[in-house]
Amino acid sequence: MSYTFDWLSKDVVKKLQGRDLRPVKCLSDATKFCLFNILQETSSRLALKTEYIPVGFTLLHLLEPNIPVPEPEVSAPIPLKHTISQKLKADLDVETIAGGEAGFVKSCGYDIEVQSKSIPNPKLESLQNRKLLDQLPTFMKTCWKDGKNLYVVTEAYEVTKDTVLEGTSNSKFAIKGIINQLVKVGGSGQWQTEKTDSIPIQKGSVLAYKKQQLVIEDNTCVILTSANTKKKMTFPMRFVGMSGHLRYQDLVIETGSWINDIDPIGTIKEPTHLDFMCLQNEVSEQTRLLAELSKDVQEVVFSSFLHMLCDRDVLYDLMKMLELNQLGHMDGPGGKILDELRKDSSLSWINLKDLILYLLQALMVLSDTQLCLLALSVEMRLLPHQVELVKSILQPNFKYPWNIPFTLQPQLLAPLQGEGLAITYELLEECGLKMELNNPRSTWDLEAKMPLSALYGSLSFLQQLSEA
């Protein structure tokens, strides 16, 4: 378990148990999920939830001026407190090795107070069917063209006073008889890290939110106020891209060639039935396209991601820039990836931006601990073995919604001895599986399905890049 803002917001959502309540992923965006803020959905992927990122505008920025703005309803403060400690430690018996130990010890707690600010459906009526401004922000052009839906925040749980999230973690590996790849010490290897996190969270930061979809037709904006309402696209019609400022009347198509390219207004395609083969085929196709990129491009992408893996904020910022189609300036390794995208040197049938987004979206599902363990796994060349192990868990259990005991295959565990085994078990435990280093048995948990799928995709991508 990694103790970060992301972990805090997810834990708060579990405690509040609100229907359709979603956690805010990143502290840097905690003030961008307030009431009326507009969110754009990310590209959809199999077995991964669609995420929602703020576009930097509120609904009030899009509507005609001087409209009545409904007053939010504010709940009484809700105190939330949580303390947790976690330990994963065991002596290891490793073939041809005299012995050793590995373990993780972590502790964390928080004591916060939140309150809900919401606009209930009856109050939203004053905003329904309002005229849009004549000139709309250019981000709407991209969303219309790409078929991305937009949403508005209608409820937000805010922190009522400044607070600090604190946590400590201790990771230790000690293996006799081998030379650790991280710290070389004579005939034995030892790696130990101790980390204390202190994350200040300002008053007004949003930890969780609810959203409702926008539908834009005939120069007006509608907020879908019922979960039972038949889903529509935000932009029921596609358009030919225009440059400069976007005017609503410019979105009317001047040719009739688009008519056969869209579904009837108000319809939505049924999703493909998900099974592991669908996920495997999707990951295989993406890694195949990745392999067709030039070695130079793959090396730049791999090196850049390796330097960013332990920094969720940088990964998230890069994902936002790509989702919002903003290839602006970015320092560090993320900037190198943007440079490659600007070159547009990839083969015409390969969309480098989509490939990078695929990996970013998978990584953002994982915890901070997993991100750092992935970097360590790359250094220790564990990826091929980890891919097969995760696949062996997903393949037989993917379709089951209930808890099923399973046993990890000995032949897949054999290459993952010592540190490799402890690192891999921690990756699995962070997905929600209960793991013990001396026990290959565990139990399938439906809540582990999504993080395991994201881990499978991340490992597969990084493995392909590492082999370039």
From Swiss-Prot:
Which residues are the signal sequence here? none
Task: State if Chaperone is listed as a keyword.
Answer: no
Cite the entry's keywords alphabetically.
Cell membrane, Cytoplasm, Lipoprotein, Membrane, Necrosis, Palmitate, Transmembrane, Transmembrane beta strand
GO annotation (BP), single: programmed cell death
List membrane-spanning regions. none
Any single Gene Ontology cellular-component annotation: plasma membrane
* Description of post-translational modifications: Cleavage by CASP8 relieves autoinhibition by releasing the N-terminal moiety (Gasdermin-C, N-terminal) that initiates pyroptosis. Palmitoylated.
Q: Which Pfam families match?
A: Gasdermin, Gasdermin_C
Residue ranges, annotated region (Triggers pyroptosis)? 1-230
Q: Which domain of life is it from?
A: Eukaryota
Q: Which PANTHER family match?
A: GASDERMIN, GASDERMIN-C
The written remark on domains in the entry is: Intramolecular interactions between N- and C-terminal domains are important for autoinhibition in the absence of activation signal. The intrinsic pyroptosis-inducing activity is carried by the N-terminal domain.
Instruction: Indicate what this protein is called per its UniProt record.
Output: Gasdermin-C
Species, as recorded: Mus musculus (Mouse)
